[in-house]
Amino acid sequence: MPEKQDNKGFWNRYAKLYDFEIKQFSGKAYLEMYRMMGDYLSPDMTVLEVATGTGLIAVNIAAYVRHVEATDFSPKMIEAARRKKAPANIKFSVEDAAVLSFEDGLFDAVIISNALHIMPDPVKALANISRVLKPKGLLIAPSYSHGHISNSTWNLNAKFLKLIGFETFSKWTPDEYVAFIGQNGFQVKRLQVLRAAFPLVYLEAQKVE
């Protein structure tokens, strides 16, 4: 069986449109996410964001924490993020979720938003996230939900996206997503579905020792 290919080429091409698309289709949900993240983040925390894109989340949660390492595997996304007027406590860098370069137990919290379903190996990504989290560290992992729209609509959108170079490797209902996170070393603490063009499942979980 051929190895699954990642979406890096797509994201490199898409970097210039990323902020516009998020605002257009998920803007209100993202504003609610920032507020919800602020409920649990604190000024003493060092936070890693995986799949930061152009840094939208990092920029909006930086005031809640001590430091944010904001990473993405797309160099073009990181270039776009670095062009922003970002708070001084954010560092942007290119990193692959499957082979994170950070030392074990470094971060109080890890944020990975709308990314696990588009990764060829989300289990490996979660294992790396768990490795760099402190004991009982916080995982914040919002993800677009499959269960709130029809299979035909989802499949039609997926086919169109694949034609332009984007592939979805996993599709989960909210219950399936909770089960997936739980099977990979985390205990889900909070779950809420936010309205967006694709409904957004906001999830917080704690690393299980």
List the model feature ranges, each with a label.
Residues 1-42, 56, 80, 84, ...:
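Conserved class I S-adenosyl-L-methionine
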Residues 48-99:
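Class I SAM-dependent methyltransferase SAM/SAH-binding core
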Residues 2-5, 21, 140-184, 189-194:
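C-terminal alpha-helical "lid/dimerization" subdomain adjacent to the S-adenosyl-L-methionine
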Residues 45, 137:
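Glycine-centered, small-residue-biased loops immediately flanking beta-strands
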Residues 123-135:
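A short glycine-rich, Lys/Arg-flanked "PGG" loop and its adjoining helix->strand segment in the class I
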Residues 109-122:
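A short SAM/SAH-binding and catalytic strip from SAM-dependent methyltransferases
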Residues 98-109:
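A short acidic, Gly/Pro-enriched loop at the edge of an enzyme's catalytic core
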Residues 37, 61, 129:
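Class I S-adenosylmethionine-dependent transferase superfamily signal
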